[in-house]
């Protein structure tokens, strides 16, 4: 079999998440529908699942198949995927490459705007926050998450799964009234990025204190800080190998 690395982008507003579901449109479901038609016999892997409404600038797949994947075939795949999914690039790669298990870093970007001015044309990709945002305050809290930590208070942790993750970058930037949060880590727990964004927005709004947040990082007590930011502001930005 030959192994192909494929980078795709998608508009999450069109899907109920990445992972295949019965009778609901998902990114994986659409991809498999097209591959079943054009390739038939294959194994599909992906770098990670995204929730309903979450977008991707670069989601990475690997496809193991006996069929030779050419530019022409990729063009046909891209066309059949429709307007909400696009193939960025593809290349043949060694058979030991796995889109998920070979990944070293993943970067997500969260986009939000404060309540000073509504921009309706951005609502599918940018969260409209209901209060003013303070860049200095947001970056004060974002630095807490750097390094290795137990994030069990900031995510939905599956049974017997190690809740420790390492964060390499955690920073907010502002352009006009658009605030973007960039986070890079070795991997993320379920809902972790949206939960971290939600906690930071709650801190911005004085609903949580620095002490409360830090205590759950230093000594998680099983009580999740359940502040989940809306999915529409989140984009899987890049996967590094």
What are these regions (language model features)?
Residues 1-241:
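Structured-RNA-binding interfaces characteristic of tRNA pseudouridine synthases
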């Amino acid at each position: 079999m030959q192994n192909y690395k494929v980078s795709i982008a998608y508009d999450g507003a069109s899907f109920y998440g990445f992972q295949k579901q019965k009778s609901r449109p998902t990114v994986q479901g659409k991809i498999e529908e097209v591959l079943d038609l054009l390739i038939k016999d294959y194994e599909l892997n992906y770098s990670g699942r995204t929730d309903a409404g979450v977008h991707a600038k670069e989601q990475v797949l690997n496809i193991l198949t006996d069929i030779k994947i050419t530019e022409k075939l990729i063009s046909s795949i891209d066309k059949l995927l429709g307007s909400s999914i696009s193939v960025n690039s593809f290349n043949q790669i060694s058979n030991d490459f796995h889109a998920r298990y070979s990944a070293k870093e993943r970067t997500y970007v969260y986009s939000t705007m404060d309540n000073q001015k509504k921009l309706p044309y951005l609502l599918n990709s940018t969260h409209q926050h209901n209060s003013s945002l303070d860049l200095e305050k947001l970056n004060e809290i974002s630095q807490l998450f750097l390094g290795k930590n137990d994030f069990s208070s900031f995510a939905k942790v599956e049974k017997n799964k190690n809740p420790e993750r390492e964060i390499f970058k955690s920073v907010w930037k502002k352009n006009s009234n658009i605030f973007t949060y960039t986070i890079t880590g070795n991997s993320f727990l379920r809902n972790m990025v949206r939960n971290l964004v939600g906690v930071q927005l709650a801190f911005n709004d004085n609903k949580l204190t620095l002490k409360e947040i830090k205590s759950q990082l230093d000594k998680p007590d099983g009580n999740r800080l359940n502040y989940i930011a809306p999915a529409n502001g989140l984009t899987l930005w890049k996967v590094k190998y």
